[in-house]
A protein has these predicted regions:
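Metal-coordinating catalytic core of metallo-dependent amide/deamination hydrolases
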Residues: 127-241
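Alpha-helical scaffold segments that flank or form the walls of functional sites
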Residues: 72-137, 156-165, 413
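C-terminal cap of metal-dependent C-N hydrolases
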Residues: 350-396
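Histidine/acidic-residue-rich catalytic or RNA/ligand-binding cores of hydrolases
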Residues: 207-219, 247-251, 269-279, 296-311
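His/Asp/Glu-enriched, well-ordered alpha-helical/loop segment
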Residues: 227-234, 276-359, 377
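Active-site gating loops and adjacent loop-to-helix segments of metal-dependent hydrolytic enzymes
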Residues: 70-101, 135-143, 207-232, 254-257, ...
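N-terminal metal-binding scaffold of metallo-dependent hydrolase/deaminase domains
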Residues: 1-42
Length: 414
């Protein structure tokens, strides 16, 4: 981990890529106190030679379950409801130590892959807070309202004691409409309002869920959320594979945020079709997430961007969703969701950046870079990740990761 004194410069960056399609060549990025001060020809402070690097804004994993790396490969090749029952069965007896180790491994993995911020839904936000400060990654997490496993009032009490720190911010996690009573959902809503944060919830993931909520309430899931005042600018809706056109209008009107998890949805055979083009046309803030390592297996946002484009083309029989759209989801839209000035490399934005080794990318042409980033490059091409001006080298992170993975193996086989 390199922490430079106050000011340093990434010099002679081979390419600087922004999510509006702008690409700069052989320019410098001056960073001061964790913020981008200048992009151009200026040099201040220490110099970091970046002549071999493609520099991107940091990537935001807008939906994951960090401890579930422990369950990677545990129960694959099952549909969502069967898979969930197996996960909950394991999670009832999952030790706190194992949860924390799982979160630590996921954080090391994500940080080494270019993820600079992540939104976590699980049961150990205090661990995530501690680890985010230790490794310098932005984390947004909270205790999860889930009637199947926890008492809602106990979750409310725990959440109220959770405090913000430099790299961590509490959010309110609600597993889903179908896994919670209306009493629990309204308790979570009140909590989010009082704590001035947002609600992060799985919605309209499967046809079964849609039918169940319709049977229970007479409304489709997003309609129902709107009817109880749960649909607003502080709501993050995850999945939405089964959403009606009039519900998209409700999301737009409420200014709610949305998260697309293409790989997980395909793997769990949830069906439906996430209407990305319609969301973009309606100027809805759409972000992208890997989901957990138990349902995706990978936490690589480069893979996720590629799968995000390909799924749209397969489902809708057109190429109207472009590579650049997915880059926006992972960068500038992610930062809009978390409420931080970032996702674009420009003065006054946070210095959250990804450095890719251009020597591994070929044929290397400026006009092909956006295509390469989404369709060709994977996280293996990432060499450094910068968060809040702190430089993390992949090799160092991977050395720590190997040690933690050995501990995990020993725990699972003891």
């Amino acid at each position: 981990m390199e922490v430079h004194n106050n000011t340093y410069t990434l010099t002679r960056c081979k390419f600087i890529v922004n999510p509006n399609g702008e690409i700069l060549t052989n320019k410098n990025i001056v960073i001061q106190n964790g913020v981008i001060k200048d992009v151009g020809d200026e040099i201040e402070g220490d110099e970091v030679d970046c002549r071999k690097y493609i520099v991107l804004p940091g990537l935001v994993n807008a939906h994951t379950h960090s401890p579930m790396v422990v369950l990677r490969g545990y129960y694959d090749d099952a549909e969502l409801n069967e898979w969930l029952s197996k996960m909950w069965e394991f999670e009832r007896n999952m030790s706190k130590d194992l949860m924390k180790l799982g979160s630590e491994i996921s954080i090391l993995e994500m940080l080494s892959q270019g993820t600079t911020a992540f939104i976590d839904m699980y049961f150990n936000p205090e661990d995530v807070k501690e680890l985010s400060e230790k490794y310098k990654i932005r984390a947004f997490a909270g205790y999860t309202f889930l009637d199947e496993l926890f008492d809602a009032y106990e979750i409310d009490k725990l959440q109220r004691a959770l405090r913000e720190s430099e790299y961590f911010k509490p959010i309110v996690n609600v597993h889903s409409l179908y896994a919670n009573s209306i009493k629990t959902i309204l308790l979570a809503k009140q909590l989010a309002e009082e704590r001035k944060t947002w609600i992060h919830i799985h919605v309209s993931e499967t046809r079964k869920e849609l039918y169940e909520i319709k049977r229970r309430t007479g409304l489709f899931p997003v309609e129902y959320m709107n009817s109880i005042g749960l649909l607003n600018e502080n709501t993050q809706l995850v999945h939405l594979g089964w959403v009606a056109s009039w519900e998209i209008e409700l999301i737009k009107k409420a200014n709610s945020k949305v998260t697309y998890c293409p790989t997980s949805n395909m793997k769990l055979a949830t069906g439906g079709a996430f209407p990305l083009e319609d969301m973009i046309k309606n100027e809805i803030t759409v972000t992208i997430g890997t989901d957990g390592a138990a349902s995706n297996n990978s936490l690589d946002l480069f893979r996720e961007m590629k799968n995000g484009v390909l799924l749209q083309r397969q489902m809708y029989w057109n190429t109207r969703v472009k590579a650049l759209d997915l880059l926006r989801l992972a960068t500038i839209n992610g930062y809009k969701l978390i409420g931080i000035k970032g996702g674009k490399i420009k003065p006054n934005n946070v210095a959250d950046l990804v450095l890719i080794n251009s020597e591994l990318v070929y044929p290397l042409y400026k006009e092909r870079l956006i295509s390469h980033i989404v369709y060709y490059i994977t996280s293996e091409y990432v060499e450094k990740t910068i968060v809040n001006g702190v430089i993390n080298d992949k090799k160092r992170l991977r050395d720590i990761l190997r040690e933690k993975v050995k501990r995990l193996y020993d725990k699972l086989n003891s």
